[in-house]
């Protein structure tokens, strides 16, 4: 992995940078939630606005004692070339696979990959380890049924924000049971990989409600199943790490990419200039550039690129 400064930040045209900057100048900034009552209100408001895609096939995974809802979106007008198992973001406490339907449908059509979105259980009603248990169950289900259900064993695992954290912990669990090799790659977008108080990045989020909701009951949050940056990262598949320079979790992503590389894994780190958390899901030129680059990486990593 090349950590030379010139290679760290992606090139963005002046026009795209200006248009993207204008979008964020007029967009209200998100603020951290103060507690459970506010979380319930935000969840209710999001639910009222949520309209999932009619293309999504809703199913349930039953694996190792866990029952996990999933949403499957297949590519239109082309055969399934592979499968992306995707964990949505939302601070561990308000994710929804349906909220990603539009994004997942675009990716399915652009790549030929079926996208399986996972509705893992949410904190604080279901704190750690509920979410990684559900994500692991979904991964094990896909490994077992991919050939019969989708006609392919070309699998890739990914997550967005909190979902990227869960993707990393899921891979570590699979690796420990000799199953991580079933996935040809991992897509990690803007995850939080240190929920402890031991590093500056960990201390930066320690007072946020999502930490309390997800893992506030755990005395040592540096355990790898919560903070994967502290884990033994050897033996993981090729990984793409994507983050923006204005993202509060930028240090976490630099740390995770460096530790993955130091452990001998193939790592691609892409940092986009002047964009905040979750930028790749925003309707901006830079967001679209990142999404297209991710599509290409997914196909190349699975050996499906042109």
Language-model regions: role of each:
Residues 1-75, 285, 303-306:
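A glycine/proline-hinged amphipathic helix-loop "lid/cap" segment
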Residues 126-146, 294:
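Alpha/beta-hydrolase active-site loop
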Residues 148-161:
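Alpha/beta-hydrolase fold nucleophile elbow
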Residues 169-221:
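Hydrolase active-site cap/lid region
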Residues 241-243:
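Short beta-strand/loop motif that positions the catalytic acidic residue
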Residues 284-306:
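Catalytic active-site module of serine/aspartate enzymes centered on a nucleophile-bearing elbow/loop
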